[in-house]
Amino acid sequence: MIPQFKNRFEKLGFDELSPIQSAVYEPLKNGDSVLGLAPTGSGKTLGFVVPVLERIAPGQGIQAIIVAPSQELAMQLTHVTRSFATLVDLKVTSITGGANVKRQLEQLKKHPEIVVGTPGRILNLIEDHKLKPHDVQTVIVDEADDLLEGETFDAVRTILQNVPSEVQMGFFSATETPILTELEKWFGTPVTRIDVRDIDHTQGEVRHGLLEVGNLKKAGMLGKLTSVKQFKALVFFNHVGSLQQTKSWLMHHHVPVATLSANQRQT
């Protein structure tokens, strides 16, 4: 790792690379295509950002594209990538759906070396000849299990068909779906599989449990679980009505709760 990045790592409080960061560094730095499998929160983002940036030369066009499944994740990736890229005089631009196209086109005119974005918007700008991919040497597909299905799968494939044939590919995911076992078949390039899920305990050992609870008793069970010391939870619902009923029950019993749903006002 170059000194600038090593110093940034140390300032962020990291004493050593995580298993996924260590395992993918050399293959990515050498230009190999990889599938990186690691638990959520294990440092996958820096695992690909650092070696990819070390291969890029300033002022020689867009050399890396990082594809994310959502605008929110793309913005997070942009922030992380930019925090390292600025150390070596590289520019990063975010290209996402739902954002102002004219502003994005203005950013592309500043000749960034790295583009981070969502597949639909990236593909649209390539097809409109606004984003020129002929210098791209690396394409990273983050949350690959999510992106490589449905319409986004087709968009990712088309993006890769528009970049040079010798492009390096990186696919990263916390879970391995069937499509991730057939990457060479779909993308025509040998991909080295790197799986550290069994050895990476960065976030501690995850224990799974199952409780069979009737629908009418689920809110009460949540209330009981809150008696566990330092209990925090994300609870997913199939219907907004059930979400609101459970929220009302918990609030009535003085349990702190917040909700997020698609029909809430966005700010």
Regions found by a protein language model. Name each.
Residues 124, 132-199:
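Post-DEXD/H (motif II) to motif III coupling segment of the RecA-like Helicase ATP-binding lobe
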Residues 1-37:
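Conserved pre-motif I regulatory segment
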Residues 204-249:
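Conserved interdomain hinge at the start of the Helicase C-terminal
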